[in-house]
Amino acid sequence: MSPTELIREIEKRRTFAIISHPDAGKTTLTEKLLLFGGAIQLAGTVKSRKASRHATSDWMELEKQRGISVTSSVMQFPYKDRIINLLDTPGHADFSEDTYRTLTAVDSALMVIDSAKGVEERTIKLMEVCRLRNTPILTFINKLDREGQEPIELLDEIERVLGIRCAPLTWPIGMGKRFKGIFHLSHNRIHLFSPTHGGKIKTGEQIQGLDNPRLSELLGNQVEELQEEIALVQGASHPFDKEAFLAGEQTPVFFGSAMNNFGVEELLDAYVEYAPSPRARETATRRVAPKELKFSGFVFKIQANMDPQHRDRIAFLRVCSGSYQKGMKLRHTRLGREVQIANVLTFMAGEREQAETAWPGDIIGFHNHGTIQIGDTFTQGEELQFTGIPHFAPELFRRVRLKDPLRTKALLKGLQQLSEEGATQLFRPLLGNDLILGAVGVLQFDVVAHRLKHEYSVDCGYDSVQVVTARWVSCNDSRRLEEFRTKAAAHLALDGAGNLTYLAPTRVNLDLTMERWPEVAFHAIREHALGVEDGNPLVASL
């Protein structure tokens, strides 16, 4: 691999995720991007779910049943001399942690907004995450073929609620029953709306210029209204500023109808033109540039049983620098171990292929036999640890109840493997034999029970447990920590990675315990793999 070849491959890559509130049309837009990219021939539209076609990115059985995305899928496809890596994030609020980690693996994000509902709660939370990292954001305002809010009101709401300047690059001509198409402001071109569903790509007539006589023929009285509106928009809105976009301060805005394949091509064309290629990444010791010749990357997700026939676990790794070549040896820095990585996968939703090479920005999958954790770094020898991949304290807890005591071993294996994915956390109290599951949303418990039954043949239920929150515990004084461990044993547990955790029965109890033990640190967040928060090492099982 020459430096020139590496730079050429880096410049080709665009890695992004789609963020939205549930039902804004994220999964449909994902399908249509794949359709325009030539990655699929038939879009599994939402309406056709009952006819046994499901969205390509919703590959897990439970997702197909419920019609929601609960895991992050990875899809790669070529488009206009670029390689697009699209990470589909969970649409359900209960899976925010998985989405948060996915957003650490991308270089930009596409925000989808329902034109009728405007900025919704989940979008606000996801944008906060993007703002922390100054992630460049493109915006697609969807469902223009239905009645919705006025476009100017939507832009105002985005600016006011999300705190990001809007630069419209396309503008709708009417909406709902009066929706006639979009005007491309920078190209001075009208693209007329022609509704198409599923796998058909119909371009619709394109007309150059607002004063074109053909426009009057087609739109009649709507032309003057459109001319006035466009003049107002051009005078009042922010012009597109690429530097402000790359700094996460301004978002280019596009309008369309994903269900009808309309406005998607303009969005995709602008995305490959404006979105950044892979960017430098922070580690605990230094910044790693993608053009460095030596390979490095980090694991942001683990998925169990992507292939139910093989009971496998796949670790998803974002390549940060250099290139992966089949069969190369890599250093697993957390374990200080050299490993030969022979069978690496690339993804198209549930479909997988063997990867011969991979470049910065690409997402590849390693087979994980229980040694890889979320946040782990792999390099060609250097002791690096990529940072910024958090683990949050869960907010809901349940005691796991096994219906068949003979399946105890299978239950433990299933819970350990599923908790490695990071959507739920398993806690084993120091006293007794309970297994306590922690999550940030109720749906996660349903998902675990469903997957235990279908993937591990384990039937389980849940009991309530007197735990309101968890805190990871650390202390620089090992003698004092051992004393705390003895005296607070009734409320202590080990998490899936062996870290000591305080399971607080009430908020008052937590406050009193923290007052009573000032030398002990209680952490609501810990970094994956590092086991460090605010400079304090989190203690593994002692």
Swiss-Prot record:
Any one GO BP annotation for this protein: regulation of translational termination
Compartments, record wording: Cytoplasm
Superkingdom as given in the UniProt entry: Bacteria
SUPFAM superfamilies reported in the protein's UniProt record: EF-G C-terminal domain-like, P-loop containing nucleoside triphosphate hydrolases, Translation proteins
Annotated GO MF terms: GTP binding; GTPase activity; guanosine tetraphosphate binding; translation release factor activity, codon nonspecific; translation release factor activity, codon specific
Record keywords: Cytoplasm, GTP-binding, Nucleotide-binding, Protein biosynthesis
Pfam families (UniProt xref): EF-G_D2, GTP_EFTU, RF3_C
Cited InterPro entries: EF-G-like_DII, EFG_III/V, G_TR_CS, P-loop_NTPase, PrfC, RF3_C, RF3_dom_3_sf, RF3_GTP-bd
UniProt keyword Nucleotide-binding, yes or no: yes
Entry's Gene Ontology cellular component terms: cytosol
Residues annotated for GTP binding in this entry: 20-27, 88-92, 142-145
Domain annotation tr-type G: ranges: 11-279
Summary of the function given for this chain in its UniProt record: Increases the formation of ribosomal termination complexes and stimulates activities of RF-1 and RF-2. It binds guanine nucleotides and has strong preference for UGA stop codons. It may interact directly with the ribosome. The stimulation of RF-1 and RF-2 is significantly reduced by GTP and GDP, but not by GMP.
Membership in a protein family: Belongs to the TRAFAC class translation factor GTPase superfamily. Classic translation factor GTPase family. PrfC subfamily.
Protein name (record): Peptide chain release factor 3
UniProt organism field: Nitrosococcus oceani (strain ATCC 19707 / BCRC 17464 / JCM 30415 / NCIMB 11848 / C-107)
